[in-house]
């Protein structure tokens, strides 16, 4: 199958894993500065806070999205740093905009029904990273402009879970056409994987791409604190967000 290439800057080659470097300097708070980042939305009673992939908790002092319907999810957040640490939080921030990322659990292994339910349609894998206990995946796929919602899933490769750290990314296009390529983001909650007991292991993700079957290895520790890293910033791209589930 032909993959219709797109020319969206080709991810620029100079970008970091999920996009541009920071515009925000923690030592110089200014309302005209901002950063765009993938974070976890954490409900806290009648409100919420944001948790970065380095473990920092951010308190939204102000927001341009007062009607945001929050839940435990991953999200792309454009924010401006307003203050240094406050009790219980690393920084106070202003949310300029926030957009939820499709956030899913690992789906069950269905044996002979894997292909019919989860699909075998190829994708182009653009980026993959683990942060705050989630696998964030940026990918591209062909679409037929029919309005059909595609399904993306992360599934085990063994019925008996004998190899729990090898998973498969699946794409079900439901027979949609191939008029154009679009990209999207999805995050998978990895909390159902076995405890690594403090060890860092290889997490292997198998993917059917337009160039054939490929495997990607990432370092994984079930304790998010052992995986803390400086968060990757991203360019918002919702081409596919309304067409996948």
Model feature map: region roles:
Residues 3, 15-41:
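Bacterial Sec-dependent N-terminal signal peptides
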Residues 1-9:
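Bacterial N-terminal signal peptides that target proteins for export
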Residues 32-245:
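First exposed extracellular module after export/assembly in secreted or surface-exposed proteins
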Residues 7, 23-25, 123, 172:
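Generic preference for well-ordered secondary structure
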């Amino acid at each position: 199958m032909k993959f219709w290439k797109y020319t969206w800057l080709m991810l620029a080659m100079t970008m970091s894993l999920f996009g541009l470097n920071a515009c925000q300097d923690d030592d110089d708070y200014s309302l005209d500065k901002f950063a765009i980042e993938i974070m976890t939305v954490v409900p806290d009673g009648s409100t919420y806070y944001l948790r970065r992939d380095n473990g920092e908790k951010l308190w939204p002092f102000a927001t341009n999205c007062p009607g945001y319907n929050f839940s435990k999810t991953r999200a792309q957040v454009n924010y401006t740093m307003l203050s240094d640490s406050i009790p219980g939080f690393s920084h106070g921030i202003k949310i300029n905009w926030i957009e939820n990322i499709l956030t899913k659990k690992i789906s069950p292994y269905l044996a002979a029904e894997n292909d019919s339910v989860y699909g075998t349609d190829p994708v182009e894998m653009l980026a993959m990273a683990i942060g705050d206990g989630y696998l964030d995946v940026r990918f591209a796929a062909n679409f037929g402009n029919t309005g059909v919602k595609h399904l993306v899933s992360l599934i085990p490769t063994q019925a008996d879970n004998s190899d729990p750290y090898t998973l498969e990314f699946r794409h079900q296009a439901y027979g949609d056409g191939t008029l154009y390529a679009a990209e999207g983001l999805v995050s998978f909650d990895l909390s159902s994987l076995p405890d690594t007991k403090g060890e860092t292991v290889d997490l292997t993700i198998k993917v059917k791409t337009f160039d054939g079957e490929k495997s990607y290895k990432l370092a994984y520790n079930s304790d998010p604190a052992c995986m803390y890293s400086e968060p990757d910033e991203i360019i918002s791209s919702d081409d596919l967000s309304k067409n996948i589930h």
